[in-house]
Amino acid sequence: MSHIYLLSPSSAVRDKAALRRGVKRLEAAGHQVEVDANALNRDTRFAGTDAERLAAIKRAAASGADTVMTTRGGYGLSRLLPALPYKAIAKSIDKGTHWVGFSDFTAFSLAVMAKTQRVTWAGPAVVEDFGALDGVDEITNLCFDDLMTHMSEGTGWRIGKDDPTAFSAQGLTLWGGNLSMITSMVGTPYLPPVTRGALFIEDVAEAPYRIERMLTQLLYAGILANQKVIFLGAFNRFNATPQDRGYGLKVVIAWLRAHTKARIITGLPFGHVPTKVLLPVGQTVDVVATRREVLVLWPHDHTHAHHH
């Protein structure tokens, strides 16, 4: 049985019923769920004032939980980066706590990686994933179980028909998350200086031209040149416009392939979609691609991140 600590470090929880469902499902799976005292706080759009949300992170770090999870993403962690209790977070990770989240949580993961060289996990949130009306996605659930039982040692998926095949790369640093969040951190001390990277990206409600514009920033900032592999997750919930005239994600991906030596692999099951694999942000990984699928493999003990 795992001890899960639940907090709201970003936007306020609107769907309380989904939160209750998520907690019930986690409990039904045999976990002991501890909900932070401020989890349902609201201050304008945020889940409490900056001070309240920081206090929740400090409590989570001191909880001794096996896993710290967020209720939801949204916006709010960017405000807290200078004040995060990095030492306490690093200590909790060294003692075996997994910090898990996605979307706005990207800011937390990358800042912790930059400041402490520790591994956190890109993965599900309680409201969106465990509280979903039609049940928890099977793959998301299996990956989460693997993490809970310390069995997590890699992930794999079917790659796109235009993706590069039959290659392998060892000792890459896996990192990434939400593209808008990554881009917002360029030029700050909270973006880790990764070389020999395996970068994964996803985004939601961003038109293809906006995704391309963010990628140009990563390109011109010299970040793409340091990646050996770039994994593309889901880019969804946007509306095409008549002026696009056939310009879409396929064109963006073709542009990306033409402007970076990194191998671009599509189809990563991650993003604002039901199926989410769990990815250790900051972990050293091996990447192996066959004709049809790609495998990302990491060691069992995932407490320390590495900057190469």
Segments (PLM) and residue ranges:
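Short internal beta-strands
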Residues: 35-36, 101, 227-234, 265-267
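N-terminal glycine-rich "phosphate-gripper" loop used for MgATP/nucleotide binding
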Residues: 67-83, 102
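Short glycine-rich anion-binding loops that position phosphate/pyrophosphate groups of nucleotides
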Residues: 72-75, 206, 236, 270
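Short, acidic/small-residue loops that bind anionic groups at enzyme active sites
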Residues: 86-111, 119-126, 263
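Internal helical hairpin/lid segments
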Residues: 193-246
